[in-house]
Amino acid sequence: LCFAPQKRIGIPLTVGQSKQIDLTLALTSVDQQVTIEDTPSVVNISTQQTSGLVDERQIKQLPLNGRSYDQLITLNPGVVNYTGQRSGSIGTSNSSVGNMFAISGRRPQDNLFLLNGIEYTGASLINVTPGGTSGQLLGVDAVREFNVVSDTYSASYGKRQGAQISIVTASGTNKFHGSAYEFLRNSALDARNYFDQATIPEFQRNNFGASIGGPIKKDKLLFFANYEGYRQNLGLSDLTLVPDNASRAAAVPSVQPLLALWPIQNGPDLGSGIAEAFSSPIQHIREDFGTTRVDYNISPKDLFFAAYTIDDSTANTPTQNPLALIN
């Protein structure tokens, strides 16, 4: 008699995940062997951390407003999208230009984003969350999966006490594959804002891009590249208090040039020489995102990869100050 050999295969491991597999050795004759394939999900008893995986199928197929894939973080329990409560607006120097999430009751500033194991920061002043001036986290096609880990995680994570969001970029395969797309949204089908006048303010958003991946050398050297562009012209509904027409007409000649700097009244009089002026100044946003990745399979057990990611963006947000020259 001897111990029967045990073998388990088909146990997937995702980013930031560990599993403990217990095998029971039994006495048997030398000609008996037990093999188990495609085992069901194993309960994680090796750590006490709370985690949630968002896989490639969810990232690619679930609808997203603006193609900002970090919105899918809210699929996990204990996550609240805190973006609407932040101060400032898109294109301004606020606490963060990307989306913000309160996870397990902690502040959004406590979270840490990792891209392929490296800290992933954005364009904000304090670099809390990734993202450009559009307020989106672009690169949906470039992401294979991401995992959100919170609460009593291991010492392999650190720097911030909040959730750790680990993002893994997509890689090439032995077959060439690619995609091209454009999402268009404009004001033709939009409703008029309560403060708008007879015409609907301009709103045009173009989300476009392409990706391609495949083999450089089959089974050995693979590549993947992705580009995504974002263009938005948004008419902001602006209500300003200005001198009324009667005040302009009664002003002395030396004051007339100063009053000319204010918008012309096009709303009702409020009394005391003040009236309302409605306008729709245009906000312009441009963002370009790109990433490339090369994988080299050194051996069945060793993999080397290199990835490069760039996000370049600008925003021109008009102000309500009548003396400003920005448009």
Predicted regions and their residues:
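Acidic, glycine-rich flexible loop segments
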Residues: 32, 40-166, 170-327
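Periplasm-facing N-terminal accessory domains of Gram-negative outer-membrane beta-barrel systems
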Residues: 1-55, 301
